[in-house]
Every structure is written in structure tokens, then in C-alpha cells.
A protein has these predicted regions:
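Charge-biased low-complexity segments
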Residues: 556-666
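Asparagine-centered strand-capping/turn motif at beta-strand->loop junctions
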Residues: 60-66, 74-76
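Extracytoplasmic/secreted cell-surface and envelope-processing proteins
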Residues: 162-164, 269-272, 302-307, 332, ...
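N-terminal, polar/Ser/Thr-rich
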Residues: 17, 22-50
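An acidic, Ser/Thr-enriched
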Residues: 73, 84-132, 136, 140-262, ...
Length: 666
């Protein structure tokens, strides 16, 4: 395992970490006095497919006599990553949010210390969000003026789990012991449904989070299989996360179907078995609302019950009331031929279904080939139910000799347990829905040419509708695609997952809330943190607004400890510095720009050595792309492509000059 060392902190800070970890609650303190209080803590949750965003807004108030620093120890929700920071200030007399910049942790801490100190320069008012330990962040805000307040906002991402047809997250109580957070939930996206504590919701305010809140998003889905592939490079390997999801409903009962139910009436069956077949047929038909039905019974010969199509409700009533006389013979093949003929003669254009139940005790000359020859004429999906057991149960039997015949139609052979008892009726209806429509994806397999043997893990062979599987791992190769395949009844379905850029960025951040954290080296952490814009052991957010405090009201060195701090004699806290990188290593910045933009230029279709791009940076930010110079004739499409690539650059922390112009030859 890579050696991940965290700098030691003061004794007071260590006690604070222990207390916060044990209580799993936030703590809010002032540095100079005990009269700094948190007045509001609002959380806005937005659920997405596979993740949720928590936008957290907090306001602190200072009733002390001097400008003070707010120290907010944040116990993050399970799996969370912090990906943004803003502080509310004023500009030209108007309220304005000032967004934070993600920086190397040491550099952010040094900059915060510089900005909060006493000096004769024009003051700036910063907020620093830094990593303290897994599951805990520290938010430092200075200054909070006497009798004034300060509002800050940070953004957390959390992974959801897909279960029972919904993307779910159980949000535990947030806030301090005395002030629980107030929760609101954004309305769901178009077509999706939101559940709060198991009940439908349109979103809105939910009030204080006094206990765990169960949030769920039921996705609108037209495909039986879904999922996501996320890949984030660490420099030496990749964080790879894939998920597969069976839709909340992988299929639907067809409307206007033509259905023939075939019941074995041979004498090898008991009266109870005949009644069980009738109960199974009635339970199956209960899922059709507007089907046309014919019933066929068979011994040596097949016999139609009606000689015409009847409404599904009538067929169900008659099945319960009609006595079926048992006869010699078990001509399954003749019964199938009769049913196929009925369906083939029916008007075209409607879904067709054929269900036959039997004990499969048949003549020896009835070979599987005859069953195969008896089906397929009408195009109906054929299910063959072999009676087995007394209680309601259905299990596919792909090893049965008749299975190949049924599979050619899209249907299956089943072990069918049934009961005519009134007490079993509800369970019968639930079980026999699987003949009306597929309820699960069977024979699930995953494949990718970029995954090592055994890397995928124990993939479930069956995914019931509404259930999923996910896996997070390191891979040596950049996974280009993952194919998921399975069967609905006997129909093959598949989904090919390609890397999603947004998901890759998201999981670059969420890796810091995952089980992979302890295996990351510091260079890998930096790579992922910059890609995911996340607070990490090596990165922090620093938000700066124009200052309003007197320059004499800065923080004295040694007074930035935990709690009230001053006069305690406790060691000072190195703010926001949990990185062991120290100073960022030297970097040829012009070469970095040339390499990064050269790659983009080539991807845009440019020829090396033919272009120059002029841009300006302020610290690690591209503030202007002045022009792109290309040889004649002018190519506006190429110019635009290269310009957009420059605007998309993520500069490393070694770009630390206040203002620089660059002319980069590509």
C-alpha cells in the first residue's frame, strides 16, 4: 500500500477530531471568543441517476467585540466529496457570491494565512475549506465582523445506490448538536419520480433533519438494461467504476394480446393438479386487461373450450367454475399444433401468447423434435409449464429437453408450482406475472477487453427488475467499454457502456470518499483531485472576496487554534495543510502549455509547427485567450476548436504568478 502520511496537528486539534468523529456532528467555534454562533444551516439535495448533490449554506453571527474567525468542523455524509466553495460578500454595494479556487493544500493554507494576517496592504476576506481526515473537513472563515454575520456555501457529492427500482441515499442528520440542518429537496427531472421516506414527493422544504431521511429517485426508463461507466486517470493507473441496472420495469404486459391457454387434462394428473393448472391460468390471465382468450384442454386430443375468442374476464371466471374431465393420452404436440393453428388464423397485428401446463408424462415416441415442429407457426411466444410442487413458484428450466423448442419462440420451459387454495390467490397472481411479462434479466454477463480476468468481481447471474450491481476498482488500462448482456425470457438483451466524461470527473472526486482512498499515492491524489475539483488530503478550496475589515484586525499568528484559542498556550494550527507535498515541484510552465495545447491542436486537426496561441493567466487561471494565429487561408473551425481547448485547461498550482502573458507555438 502506498505510504500516505498526514502531518501531525496540535493537541487541541487532535481532541477536536476525536470529539467530532465520536459524535458524527459538526462543531462551530470562534477563534477569539465564545460568542460566535451558527444561526442557520440549510441543505438543498438534488438527486440524479447514480449520485446526489448537497448544496450546503451556513450563516454564522459574531456577538463578540472584535472581528473573529469561524471554525466549522464538518462531519461529511457517507461517501461524500466536497467539490465547491463560495462566500457571500458585496461588490459595488450589491450582494455577490465569490467562488473558491481549488489549490494545492500547502499553498492554499499559506495564502489564507497571508490574507488573514495584520498588514498595511488592502485587506482580503477569505474562506478556506480543507481536508482534516476521512469523513471530516474544516471550514475557516475570516473575518466575521462584530455584530455582523457571514454566509458561506459548499457543495458535496454523494454516491447513491440503485435498489428496488430507485437511486437511493439515506441522508443522516446533519448539523451541530444544537442546530440541525434544515433540508429541502429539488423537484425530480422530467419523467422521474421522487420519494421521500418512501412516499411520493414533488420536492420542497422538509424541515430540520432530526433523523435519517430516505431519499429516492425512480428513473423513467424505456430500456431494460442501463448503467454507467466512469474512468478517471491517476497518472499510473485508472479509477474505474461501472454500474448495471435493471429498469424498474424491464417489460410490460402487451395490450390487446391474443392468448391461448392449454391445460393438460390427462389421467396422470390428480384432481388437485388439474385445479392447480386452472388456478395458474387464471392468475396468469389476471395481468391482461383487454386480451382475447381461448382455452384448450387435451388428453389424447385437443379440445377447444369456446370455439371463438372471449374476453379475458369471462375466461377467468369460467376457469374457476368449470369442471375439466380427465381423459387418456397426453398429446402435448397435438395440443400445441391446435393452439398454434388458432393463433395463426386470428387477425394479424396483435401480440400472441401461448401457455401450456402439463406434468410432462408423455409417450416415449414424443421426441423433442416433435415439440419443436409443433411451435412457431403463429409467431406466438410459447411458455411450457411443467408441474412441480404444491406451492406457488416459477423457475425457468433451461436444461429441459423441450427448452430449445420454447426458446425459438422467445419463451421458456418452467418448473411450475401452483395452488388452488383461496389463501394462496394473492401469491399466485404475483408469481404468475412472470408468464405475462419478464420480471428479471437472466444469465447476466459482463465483458470488456480492457479488464483483467477476475477484475469484474462476482457479477450476479440474475438481476431482478429494479436491482443493480456496481463495482469500483483500479485498472491498469483505460477501459474503453463494458458490454452487459443477458436474457429477458429467452430474448437476448445487451447494453454497451462507454466512458462518460461527467461520470469520470464525478468519480475522480468521489474516490476520496471511497474504499480506494487508502491505496492512493499523493501524486495520484493530486491528479484525481484536480480532475474532480475536489477537496482532498492534497488540495483545498480558497474563496476570496474584497475586504471590508480594518487592516489592523487581522489574525495574530498563534491565535488560529481550535475553539477560542487565544491565551491557551496551545500550539498553533497550520490551516488547511494536511498535504505532505510541501512546495509544489518545479515545473516548466511554458513547456506544460505547449504540450497540453499541442495535444489539443492535433486533436482539432492542426499540423504541428503551424500555429501560435496567445493567452493570459493569473495564477492558475486562464483569464484570456487573445488570439489563435494560423497560416492562410483562415480556418474558423480550427481556430474555435483550439481556442476552446485553451479555455478548458486546468492549470497546475505551479502557475503561481499574479499575471503572465504567453505566446505558445503549436
Amino acid at each position: 500500500m502506498p505510504d500516505v502520511r498526514i502531518r501531525p496537528v496540535s493537541a487541541a486539534l487532535g481532541l477536536g477530531l476525536i470529539a467530532a468523529s465520536a459524535s458524527a456532528q459538526d462543531q462551530v467555534h470562534g477563534t477569539r471568543s465564545e460568542r460566535l454562533y451558527e444561526r442557520s444551516h440549510d441543505v438543498r439535495a438534488t438527486l440524479h441517476h447514480g449520485w446526489a448533490e448537497l448544496r450546503v449554506r451556513r450563516r454564522v453571527e459574531n456577538e463578540g467585540p472584535r472581528h473573529d474567525q469561524a471554525m466549522i468542523w464538518i462531519s461529511t455524509p457517507a461517501g461524500a466529496a466536497a467539490v465547491g466553495l463560495k462566500t457571500l460578500g458585496t461588490l459595488a454595494g450589491q450582494p455577490r457570491w465569490f467562488s473558491g479556487e481549488l489549490m494545492e493544500a500547502e499553498a492554499a493554507a499559506a495564502r489564507y494565512r497571508e490574507l488573514t494576517g495584520i498588514g498595511g496592504y488592502y485587506p482580503k476576506d477569505p474562506a478556506l475549506l480543507s481536508w482534516r481526515s476521512e469523513g471530516q473537513l474544516l471550514l475557516q472563515v475570516f473575518p466575521v465582523a462584530p455584530n455582523g454575520d457571514k454566509t458561506i456555501e459548499y457543495t458535496l457529492l454523494v454516491p447513491t445506490r440503485y435498489k428496488d427500482g430507485a437511486h437511493r441515499y439515506d441522508l443522516e442528520r446533519l448539523g451541530t448538536e444544537s442546530l440541525p440542518a434544515t433540508l429541502s429537496v429539488a423537484p425530480p427531472g422530467r419523467g422521474d419520480r421522487l420519494l421521500v421516506n418512501g412516499k411520493p414527493s414533488a420536492g420542497g422544504a422538509l424541515g430540520a433533519t432530526g433523523k435519517t431521511t430516505e431519499l429516492a429517485l425512480v428513473p423513467k426508463s424505456s430500456e431494460p438494461l442501463g448503467g454507467e461507466l466512469a474512468v478517471a486517470a491517476t497518472g499510473t493507473r485508472h479509477v474505474t467504476r461501472f454500474s448495471i441496472e435493471a429498469a424498474p420495469e424491464v417489460s410490460r404486459v402487451p395490450r390487446g394480446a391474443q392468448v391461448v391457454v392449454v391445460i393438460d387434462a390427462s389421467r396422470s394428473l390428480s384432481d388437485e393438479q388439474v385445479d392447480a393448472q386452472k388456478a395458474a391460468a387464471a392468475a396468469y390471465l389476471s395481468h391482461f386487461r383487454d386480451a382475447a382468450v381461448e382455452v384448450v384442454t387435451f388428453g389424447r386430443k385437443a379440445q377447444r373450450r369456446y370455439g371463438t375468442w372471449v374476453a379475458v374476464d369471462r375466461a377467468r371466471r369460467d376457469l374457476v367454475a368449470t369442471h375439466i374431465e380427465r381423459k387418456n393420452g397426453s398429446a402435448v404436440d397435438e395440443a400445441l399444433l391446435e393452439a398454434e393453428g388458432i393463433l395463426a388464423a386470428a387477425p394479424a397485428g396483435r401480440p400472441r401468447r401461448l401457455v401450456l401446463t402439463t406434468d410432462a408424462i408423455v409417450r416415449s415416441r414424443l421426441k423433442p423434435e416433435r415439440i419443436r415442429a409443433a411451435v412457431g407457426q403463429s409467431g406466438a411466444v410459447v411458455h411450457l409449464g411443467i408441474l412441480a410442487g404444491d406451492g406457488p413458484a416459477l423457475t425457468r428450466n433451461d436444461d429441459h429437453l423441450w427448452a430449445p423448442a420454447a426458446r425459438t419462440t422467445g419463451g421458456l420451459v418452467w418448473r411450475a408450482g401452483a395452488s388452488a387454495d383461496a389463501g394462496a390467490r394473492k401469491q399466485m397472481v404475483a408469481v404468475y406475472e412472470e408468464w405475462a411479462r419478464p420480471l428479471r434479466v437472466d444469465h447476466v454477463k459482463l465483458y470488456s477487453p480492457d479488464l483483467e480476468v477476475g477484475a469484474i468481481g462476482e457479477v450476479p447471474q440474475v438481476l431482478d427488475e429494479g436491482q443493480g450491481y456496481e463495482h469500483l476498482l483500479f485498472t491498469q488500462r483505460d477501459v474503453s467499454w463494458v458490454r452487459v448482456e443477458g436474457e429477458l425470457w429467452s430474448k437476448r438483451v445487451e447494453r454497451v457502456l462507454h466512458p462518460d466524461a461527467a461520470a469520470g470527473k464525478r468519480w475522480a472526486a468521489l474516490a476520496f470518499g471511497s474504499s480506494l482512498l487508502g491505496e492512493l499515492s499523493e501524486p495520484e491524489m493530486m491528479k484525481l483531485a484536480l480532475a474532480g475539483a475536489a477537496v482532498s488530503p492534497v488540495t483545498s478550496y480558497l474563496a476570496i472576496e474584497p475586504g471590508v475589515r480594518p487592516s489592523t484586525e487581522g489574525l495574530e499568528h498563534g491565535t488560529v487554534g481550535f475553539g477560542s484559542g487565544f491565551g491557551s498556550g496551545a500550539p498553533s494550527l497550520r490551516m488547511g495543510a494536511t498535504s505532505t507535498l510541501g512546495r509544489a515541484p518545479p515545473l516548466d510552465r511554458e513547456k506544460w502549455l505547449k504540450d497540453a495545447l499541442g495535444t489539443s491542436f492535433a486533436a482539432c486537426g492542426g499540423k504541428a509547427g503551424t500555429a501560435t496561441i496567445s493567452l493570459e493567466t493569473t495564477f492558475a487561471e486562464v483569464v484570456d485567450v487573445a488570439r489563435v494565429t494560423l497560416p492562410a487561408p483562415r480556418d474558423p473551425v480550427l481556430e474555435r476548436c483550439v481556442s476552446e481547448a485553451a479555455w478548458d485547461l486546468v492549470l497546475p498550482p505551479q502557475f503561481d504568478a499574479e499575471w503572465t502573458t504567453w505566446a505558445v507555438e503549436l
